[in-house]
């Protein structure tokens, strides 16, 4: 038989139960947080970048019953808090803004208190035209505030991830923590237990008392 982990691997709460969880190599995790921190969320290109970063992040389990935990590498085990925060960031990055993106960087344009317009006709009379307060303006304001919510959610979730203490494992503490050993499966000795080996001198074999 080939090399594999011993029976401790399959015990409740052991490594076998964690194989479907999210594991991220420590360097890749730190690189992800650094890139997310530098993203310009106000720009659509920045939000698209977030989607790409999360899509390419490998979260596969680095071991199996027949594959020993990697040597000289540290992995973080992502718990429910980390996975939820990543999901929130993914949802926030999916926001599509209809208004000009420059407004999101500069802030909301001030709206006059009385935005009515007065026009003088050829006959000398004046007419007053009320500003557009219909659905277009309402949609722009709604879109802005929804964007503001998405931006706030993104930055709060990122800060949470940066301050989160995750469980980290490398080969030695992984195998020590779970009490597992990796190696060749033992095979029973030929001849069965209790068999008496032949004498070196070639003399007669005496029966066991």
UniProtKB/Swiss-Prot annotation:
Chief localization: virion
GO molecular function, one term: structural molecule activity
Gene3D superfamilies: Tobacco mosaic virus-like, coat protein (1.20.120.70)
Protein name, entry field: Coat protein
Subcellular location: Virion
UniProt keyword terms in alphabetical order: Capsid protein, Virion
Superkingdom as given in the UniProt entry: Viruses
InterPro entries given in the database record: TMV-like_coat, TMV-like_coat_sf
GO cellular component terms, A-Z: viral capsid
Region (Disordered), start-end ranges: 108-132, 181-209
Keyword Electron transport: no
Ranges annotated as biased composition (Low complexity): 116-132
